[in-house]
Amino acid sequence: MKKYCLFVSLTLVIVLTSCSKHVTDPLVSNTYFSQWNECTALSALKDYVDDVTNPKSPNFIKVEDHIATFDMDGTFVGELFPTYFEYNLLEYRVLDDPAYRDKAPEDVRQTAQEIRDFVRNGKPLPDHFNLKHGRAAAKAYSGMTLAEFDAYVKAFAEKPANGFKGMTFGQGTYKPMLEIINYLKDHGFTYYVVSGSDRYIVRALATAVGFDANHVIGADYGLCSSKQGDANPLDYTMDKDEKIIRSDEFILKDEKNNKVLQISKEIGKVPVLSFGNSSGDAAMHNYCLSNNRYRTAAFMLVADDDARDHANLAEAAKREAKWREANYYIISMKNDFKTIYGPNVQKVDFVFPK
């Protein structure tokens, strides 16, 4: 009798264990993807993960090569309140922050004003504004320690997100995309943020939703130790009481092909999964799809929901057509997401102080 009970117990354990690992089980799928509608992109992702994590599959990928890359703005963090987080932050720093606004150099002030004119009046930004912004941001945050800057970013992230009710900037993440991140983590994937935004802004925002600080790649700015001054770092040795501070040097904007080069330098492996939302992510996607060793997949999120977000539907339609032609999987915010920012968040009109 004891042997029979032991056999039944072991059998039950084996059955329960095998069920808990079967990613296609409806209960498991519902646990991971409660914020999703059934859709082609989600089915494709689950099929992909099921396939490449199955040791018996010809497409099996060793766990050390389970590399996934994510853009940030517009991919898992909102970029429509009313523009990129880092643009909103610089506008505030230069034009509204009483601790800095009277110190801002004229070129930095001009850049911040161009952001304000863009978001409030619809005035187009100048060509190559991403580089102009980078140079201005380098000056605006120069002298801040990394800890001070991290705290500054997080304090701004606690402000109400313009254009929404019931949400701060920091809470403005796409909840369905966070479910994908958790799903991949639980299935042995190592995931990186590869963003065009300031690396240290991305660290502050992305670590709050589960990314490790050393898995963040972004636009690069100069650093130095606090007493280094103008000394060449090759000719200088920092003291024990020094801290690392931001310099006024803008080094690199991590967009388009720079994303590929940064991935190659910092990760050292070609991703097998890639997630993005814009032309700035296409090179990263193509780099992923060029990985001939393994089965790969790339996903583009389309901001096509003007009921729950401040979407430009004409632009969304153009992007969707382009991404389908490139053979990327399409994630539709309107059709595929049960919620975007959460059930208690409501889109409202933008409000600007007079």
What role is predicted for each listed range?
Residues 4, 18-72, 80, 94, ...:
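Non-catalytic pre-domain segments flanking phosphatase-related domains
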Residues 8-15:
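Bacterial N-terminal signal peptides
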Residues 14, 82-86, 206, 292:
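Single-residue recognition of alpha-helix boundary sites
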Residues 23-34, 50, 65, 148-354:
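C-terminal cap/substrate-recognition subdomain and adjoining C-terminal extension
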Residues 81-84, 88-170, 175:
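A metal-dependent, Asp-based hydrolase signature
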